């Protein structure tokens, strides 16, 4: 049941993210609530506690990227929903494999689209901005203002979740 639910969630998220570049709140919130309910049904209040902890760990790991305007809110809510199903340890493993998959996908996309040199210049500018001003959003470099290729980050999130299911 758990594997099937996560596969359904990430499949739907990828479908929406690839088509519309958005992940619906109904999907992310509904998936999180279903994860809380499933954990409670399986293990009572301790299950609910682990589910809430999984949601919190996942959101805490990805929220900074949203606050720095490098990731959409739907992506954060999606990893939170996955964390609600997998608990805190599963959320950590999923976050790791999501980061790996996201890095590989980003590299493939920038190389395929001839954007590598500009992306390295942008990365340098962001790092210098953070060095001078601290970890704050770079006003001219947000998801909304970017001219570069965009990633449907539900895809690496799905990859991270599926690898987590596979190795556990």
Give the residues covered by each predicted segment.
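A membrane-topology feature that recognizes alpha-helical transmembrane segments
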Residues: 1-168
